[in-house]
Amino acid sequence: MSKGRLLVIEGLDGSGKATQAKLLASYLAESGRKVMEITFPDYESDSSALVKMYLSGQFGDKPDDVNPYAASSFYAVDRYASYKTKWGSFYEAGGIVIADRYTTSNAVHQCSKLPPEQWDDFLRWAFDYEYRLLGLPAPDAVVYLQVDPAVSQKLMTGRYHGDESRKDVHEKDIEYLARSRRAAEYCAEHLGWSTVHCTENGAMRTIEDIQAEVRALAEKELG
């Protein structure tokens, strides 16, 4: 039996990844396809312990306090454990997996800790580590949900009802988020991701409009 397909929904915080991934998985299931939705980090698993320590500031108050290679390893191990225990067999048996974040998040959030001239080397290392050395499957397609930074910040503030203390070390650092957006734009352009522009005239497009575009991209990939 041929292996399955892996479609990734990527984007910065506040871009609506979880909503769009869930809607896409439901749509594909309703069309008769064998589909599973996964989310990273896998906070329900013990494998995310180092990720939680990192994001809660136990290794430093700023994202840059943890170098990108160490931080990437935290997330990679979490993905490996998830693959081995939750979705690997399903994927290997031909199922369609919809991922809310994946290896692509390391590309976005950890590249941003480095000067741009080092991005290509880091990306080669990150993907070689996860796909070749760890044996995780590479995605068949990545959909990048692009959101204007001001809109993203407003959405995140609303998520926590104005309580800034609930934000993790990434979400609290505006300058870091700006760098991550630049890294995301670079990755989308150079790694062949499909970009969905989620904001229009300073506001989010409707969930339904965005989902229609996401579905069209998924159908094009799945055939």
Feature-to-residue mapping (PLM):
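ATP-dependent small-molecule kinase phosphotransfer cores
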Residues: 31-128, 132-134
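A glycine- and Lys/Arg-enriched "phosphate-lid" helix/loop adjacent to the NTP-binding pocket
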Residues: 104-182
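Hydrophobic positions on the alpha1 helix immediately C-terminal to the Walker A/P-loop
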Residues: 20
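NTP-dependent small-molecule kinase module
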Residues: 25, 150-223
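Hydrophobic anchor at the beta1->P-loop junction of P-loop NTPases
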Residues: 9
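Conserved lysine of the Walker
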Residues: 17
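Pre-Walker A (Motif I) flank of P-loop NTPase domains
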Residues: 2-6
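P-loop (Walker A) phosphate-binding loop of NTP-binding proteins
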Residues: 12
